[in-house]
Structures are given as C-alpha cells and as structure tokens.
C-alpha cells in the first residue's frame, strides 16, 4: 500500500521496453516501483527471510509450507503498550476554537487548545459530574473547557474552575479532587500531537526522559511534508502488516497507477527527469508473467527486538518503530547507518540531492478500529505542494485506501477465527516478498502475545459488526470531517453547486420574463445554452462531491 499511497504525491517515471523501445508516463505522479522492492544482503548479524518455494522433489515429500528462518536478539522482554507515546492527530487538522474528541488505545480523549498556556492539552473526555463527554463542549470566553451539560469549567491542568450550581457562600466544592479531570502528558513533535497514556502525576514530566520517535526528515525545513489522516475500519495489526507488504500493490491497487503493458521481457529503468529521486538504482530485468506485473521480491531484515526492526531494500531502508511508526526511506536512520556498508561516492551524491521517505503512523483505536496518519516528505518538487491544495492529493490517497479496504476488513475476521497467535500456521508464506510482514507478526506474537493490550476495556475476540458497504467505505466521517483541507473544499464545492443551480434557474427565469422584443434570438440562445451548461455543471459537481468526499466503491472484478 505504501507505494500506491505515495503515488498521488510523487512525480512521474518512465518504463522502457527493450524490444521495441517505448516510453509511457503515468497520469498521476507515482513511484517507479513499490518502495519495498527488495534485495537480500548475505552478511548480517540478524536475518529474517521467508524461504523460497520448495523444489518439485521436495514438494512431493511434504505438503507443509516451508518455515521462515529467524535469529532473535537474546534477552528480549514483553512490550509495554502503556509505556510509549501515541500520536493523536496532526495539528494542521485541529481547530483551536473547539475541543476535539479522539479515541486512542481505547481511551476517550478530548484535545483542545489552551490559549492561556498557549499549548495543546490532552485530557480524559469525561466530565466528573455526570460523565458527559467534554469533547461535545466549548471553550468559553476565559479560555476554559466548558462541559455544556451543566456548565462546569476546567483549566488546562484539569482543575475545576467553576460549578455554576454551587452557592457562592457555600463550601468551595470546585476545588475538591473529585471535581478534577485527568490530564495526560502531551507534546507536539513533527507537527503531530502525541500523548502518554497514563495520567498518574509521576508521569507529568515523562517528556524529559522519554520522547516520541524522532524522524529526521520531518524536522528538516528543506523537505515538504503534507499530512493526511483517516479512521480505518479494521484493526491495528492488519493495518501495519498491509503497509509493509509491497507485493499486493500491483494487484489490490491495480488501475490506480497506469502501468504500461509490455510484452515479453522488459526493463524497468529509473529516469532522472521529473524530480525522480531514484537515479542511483540499478536497472532491473524482469519477465512479465501477468497483466498486473507482479515479480519476485526480496528483503533483508535486521535486529528484531521489542522496539521493532529495520530492513534493507533495493530502493532504500525501512524501519518499524514500535508500536506506531513505519518508515521507508532512501536513507537509514542515523543510529542505523553503521549496520550497512557506506554507499559509493556517486550514490551518496545522488542521495544527497534527492531524498524521499514514506512515513505511516498506525494508531490502535479499539478492536477492529485504527487510525492512519501519513506523510511523504521529500526534498525535491517542493513547489508542487505549495501550489496544489492538500485535498487534491487526498483524492487519490483515499482511493488507494478504499481499494483494499474490504479485503482487509474481511481478512481481519478470518485471522480472528483462526487465532492471531496462529497467523503463521494459518497462512501459507512461501516467498520472500512477505519477509517484512512475517517479521512484524513475529514481533506482535513474541512481545505482545498477538494482541494489543486493551487492559480489559474490550473483549479482544469480538469485532464490530460489518456495516453495509456504503457505510464501510464512508469517507466523510472517516476523513473529511477530520481533515481541515478536505472539509473546507467540501464546504466550498457544495456552495458552488448551489450557485450553479441557482444560476441555471435564474437564467431561464430571465428569458421567461423578458419579452421577445427585448432580447434578440442570439441572446436568447446564448442564455439558454448557459443555463443548460450551468445545470449540467451542477449535476457533474454533485457527482464529484459524492464520489470524492462521501463514497467511492472499488470493484476489482471490473478493473
């Protein structure tokens, strides 16, 4: 999925056939190949590789799938889900004038801007009075968070500052501990709000000793980094493994990137035009075996521990920083550079000029629910993001998410039927293209017993019922309402639709009111044509709004 999502944010490439020579460019900016097109390095102190399919002789002797090989770091310990920072939302999609309700790790949160302290606050989304959600409240004229059920007001420290029903000459009940709201440690890093899921006062200054994952390119001013977010109707583990899987891209997302259809053997060659960052990669020779163009992929995974793992691929490097961050980049993280041989001088020069990363932040919400924040920072073609509004990129990126959404929603239920801890036994994994996915599942099984620790809030073996397809693929409540750019575009385009409808009716009305002697035949025809065009434009715009911001199905059988 990562290659496909990035396709809507990256410039074009060219794919050349050996016989005959031809060129073909994509209609949408796209990656040349999946960012996880991988190569295997032989020397490694830690390796995870999925074994190749058995030979014919071996296949006749056994029907069991080959077991992946792995070497694990000694002294591993269990992953503590409540001793880590979790992202909540990009600040570009939060309105400072209103409180926002979000759920992370099964915890109901209210996120709001405290203008008195000039910072974002993350608090328990529960009023201590009658347990009403504070996210349905407002920020009053004094900058306090007000519960609109009975008017109780709270400051950024969670202290109750006003109980309107308490007599002024009575005891100061608003100062009682029971009147306070739990406040979670929070910080803004990489223009994203993060919170620590423990409101115990001893964690108040946890940021001094434990910080959220640091991603260098998100702090580099030479990189562009437009963000997007969407609520996903399947769970955290399925979301993460899908983003790590390069082999599904040409199939599950077929038709979203228009690849050429060469016959026989062809060369995938990376052009240095159109701001392409991959000029240092070798030319690949592959044989086309089907319409979609799938091919063998390899990967080399290093250092699996409870903090995650990292890997080397053909186009660059990948990191899973547990529990939320998956990063693919042309460069390794600084602390991992010693794990790989230094690139050649020419390669290093190319990388220093054009650098690209794909950042996916996967947030556990509740069983069967997750949230994805994505950004594709790059230091080339920066002007494109300054010209094109963010919502335009989100059109294609949401279509990518929709195209395999139903597959993953159903897959999650089948995994649960067989038991998440039995994933490797239930799935037949004979090729190396699944190495990243296998490694993530091993991390999930080994360090977390194949489940998110919900601390008893949910039954981990129960998932929400599958809704009707139009509700499952809903874009408005899962994305538009949570994206400031798409929400604004939706509002303005709806207004434009109404204007076009009014204009078409008004022009017909003008023709009816004015006498024939007042308006020439040419003018009458012109007004009539304008009215028809205006009405047609309003109907087209209505369809565009619905398909872009509400519901866009994806039928693989007819693509």
UniProtKB/Swiss-Prot annotation:
Coiled coil: none
Transmembrane segments: 493-513, 525-545
Stored SUPFAM superfamilies: Bet v1-like (SSF55961), ISP domain (SSF50022)
Protein keywords: 2Fe-2S, Chloroplast, Iron, Iron-sulfur, Membrane, Metal-binding, Oxidoreductase, Plastid, Plastid inner membrane, Protein transport, Transit peptide, Transmembrane, Transmembrane helix, Transport
Biased composition (Low complexity): 47-64
Claim: DNA repair is one of the keywords in the record: no
Enzyme class at the top of the EC tree: oxidoreductase
Record's GO cellular component terms: chloroplast envelope; chloroplast inner membrane; cytosol; plastid
Cellular localisation: Plastid, Chloroplast inner membrane
Transit peptide, residues from-to: 1-55
Alphabetized CDD domains for the sequence: Rieske_RO_Alpha_PaO
Membrane topology, from the record: Multi-pass membrane protein
Protein name: Protochlorophyllide-dependent translocon component 52, chloroplastic
Organism the protein comes from: Arabidopsis thaliana (Mouse-ear cress)
Organism taxonomic ancestry: Eukaryota, Viridiplantae, Streptophyta, Embryophyta, Tracheophyta
């Amino acid at each position: 999925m990562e290659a496909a999502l990035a396709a809507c944010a990256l410039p074009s490439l060219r794919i050349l056939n050996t016989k005959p020579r031809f060129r073909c460019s994509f209609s949408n900016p796209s990656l040349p190949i999946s960012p996880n097109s991988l190569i295997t390095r032989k020397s490694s102190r830690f390796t995870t590789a999925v074994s190749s399919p058995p030979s014919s002789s071996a296949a006749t002797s056994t029907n069991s799938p080959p077991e992946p090989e792995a070497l694990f770091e000694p002294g591993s310990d269990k992953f503590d889900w409540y001793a880590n920072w979790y992202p909540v939302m990009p600040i570009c999609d939060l309105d400072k004038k209103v409180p926002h309700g979000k759920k992370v790790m099964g915890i109901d949160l209210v996120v709001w801007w405290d203008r008195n302290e000039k910072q974002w606050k993350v608090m328990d989304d529960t009023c201590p009075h009658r347990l009403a959600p504070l996210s349905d409240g407002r920020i009053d004229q004094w900058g306090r968070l007000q519960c609109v059920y009975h008017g109780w007001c709270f400051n950024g420290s969670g202290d109750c500052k006003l109980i309107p029903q308490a007599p002024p000459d009575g005891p100061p009940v608003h100062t009682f501990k029971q009147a306070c709201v739990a406040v979670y440690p929070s910080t803004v890093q990489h223009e994203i709000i993060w919170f620590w899921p423990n409101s115990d006062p001893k964690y108040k200054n946890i940021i001094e000793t434990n910080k959220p994952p640091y991603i260098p390119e998100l702090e580099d001013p030479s990189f562009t980094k437009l963000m997007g977010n969407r609520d996903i109707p399947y769970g955290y583990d399925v979301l993460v493994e899908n983003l790590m899987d390069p082999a599904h891209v040409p199939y599950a997302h077929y038709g979203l990137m228009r690849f050429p259809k060469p016959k026989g053997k062809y060369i995938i060659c990376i052009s240095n035009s159109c701001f392409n960052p991959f000029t240092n990669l070798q030319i690949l020779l592959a044989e086309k075996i089907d319409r979609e163009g799938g091919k063998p992929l390899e990967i080399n995974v290093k250092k699996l521990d409870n903090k995650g793992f990292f890997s080397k691929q053909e186009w660059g490097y990948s990191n899973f920083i547990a529990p939320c961050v998956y990063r693919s980049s042309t460069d390794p993280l600084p602390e991992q550079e010693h794990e790989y041989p230094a690139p050649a001088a020419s390669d290093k020069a190319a990388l220093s000029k054009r650098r690209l990363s794909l950042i996916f932040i996967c947030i556990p919400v509740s069983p069967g629910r997750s949230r994805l924040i994505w950004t594709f920072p790059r230091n080339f073609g920066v002007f494109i993001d300054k010209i094109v509004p963010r919502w335009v990129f989100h059109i294609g990126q949401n279509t990518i998410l929709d195209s395999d959404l139903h597959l993953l929603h159903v897959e999650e239920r089948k995994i649960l039927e067989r038991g998440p801890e039995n994933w490797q036994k239930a799935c037949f994994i004979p090729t190396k293209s699944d190495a990243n996915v296998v490694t993530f599942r091993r991390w999930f099984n080994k360090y977390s017993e194949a489940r998110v620790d919900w601390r008893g809030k949910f039954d981990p073996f129960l998932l929400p019922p599958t809704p009707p397809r139009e509700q499952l693929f809903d874009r408005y409540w899962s994305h538009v309402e949570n994206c400031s750019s798409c929400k604004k575009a939706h509002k303005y385009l709806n207004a434009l639709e109404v204007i076009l409808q009014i204009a078409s009716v008004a022009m017909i009305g003008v023709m009816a009111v004015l006498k024939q002697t007042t308006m020439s035949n040419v003018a009458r025809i012109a007004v009539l044509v304008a009215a028809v065009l205006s009405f047609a434009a309003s109907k087209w715009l209505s369809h565009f709004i619905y398909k872009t911001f509400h519901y866009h199905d994806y039928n693989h059988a007819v693509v």
